[in-house]
């Protein structure tokens, strides 16, 4: 919220924004009083830092620098405080290695920043010590956000972009916690929202009221040796019996090498309001873990055949092998970088590998012909993101081939097995989404396509039979710092050889890292904003909101 917003607090919209900002700011500045510093620092790291700097503090080579084994002198600590408070971008050298990435500012109070940096100082062989809230406050005063309050107030919600002709766009609710998935029975009365830590909330679409349904601490399995808590919970859907399914990914270092465990929880009853309740483990599988690039299960959905389809992503960026270490192991396993099919009606389902070579399937849906269309996020090597027609038994290239490239993405890219044939992505014929005068397969590198929906006959001509794809936006430094941050409309048609090709138009832009879309009610699409930033230099600490795009009433 900015001073400009303060001038309009007399009206209802302004008052609502002020209340939301106030609640967020209050939580930001008082959360540090609830737990002991060691626990709080670890949990803050898991929520805000682990995705890029990894569970072992090693970072990602060339992109996100390590926090383990670096300069933690007084000058180094001051530099770390400054980066957390105001962000950083551009080339830098850490431990003699060059990095060229982006770190957005993290919206935390002085005490919380002190706690998370104290956790870092006392982890992974770092020298130990303690950072105080006073140290943070003194360094922050010299940054472009001189107080925590000024920083929080600067992170207002972006204005809504114009709705396309024939539609309305409205804000349904502002979220108390960042959410990654939506699910519903499709009737348009309510949405269920999944946070990345596993909390589930119910959103009343008529009133915008949000209430907790069940919390991660009450149902997620905990084991000695767990790293993070959990690593990611990113998939949620209903089965045909109305049971809610939630997939969690957890790394555990009790075994050597460390493992990644996927657990799918399933609700077992309804509460007094008729909402799903009491989730319990239904399916579990483990395979060798990795400190970086554990994409694991990121989407699942019931198909037209009644089976549960589960996208289990790659455990590496490009299929590389590690010879030793706590996360040792080969590149991929037979059940990673692929699409599973499970029978939701049996108590101990077996994995059928439905399709292979899929690096990171963040979304898929079926059209009115029963064809599955899937979004796929690409590697750090700047290959285009993909849109694929998924057919049983096919291989979609990973880790041997990205997009429709004929060159290797990396010097270490493994050679494919003899005779293996790849199915290439759908070509984008423009005008948007990465098209730059010649067809591309399929979207801008690092634009991060997320969920996907197919629009049926309850949408107007020009939209009926097309797909909507939100794009989370780039996390890696690129020439275009605003690649993604939008919702695309994708129209597919067959070329002379029978292959699908796409016409892609930008429908909504800019948005605050849109991550999922969901159909609920006739002619209504719900869009989930993960946070509020509309370019990759903006903080993604503050939680986002749910928007409704609806066919306008005639």
Regions found by a protein language model. Give the residues of each.
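Bacterial N-terminal signal peptides
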Residues: 16-27
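Bacterial Sec-dependent signal peptides at the C-terminal "C-region" and cleavage site
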Residues: 28-36
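Sequence/structural segment immediately N-terminal to covalent heme-attachment motifs in c-type
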Residues: 35-60, 73-86, 173
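Beta-propeller domain segments
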Residues: 157-163, 231-233, 250-253, 269, ...
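Gly/Gly-Pro-rich "capping" loops immediately C-terminal to redox-active cysteine motifs
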Residues: 58-95, 100-110, 210-218
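N-terminal secretory signal peptides that target proteins for export/translocation
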Residues: 1-15
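Flexible coil segments in periplasmic/lumen-exposed cytochrome c-class electron-transfer proteins
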Residues: 34-35, 94-168, 172
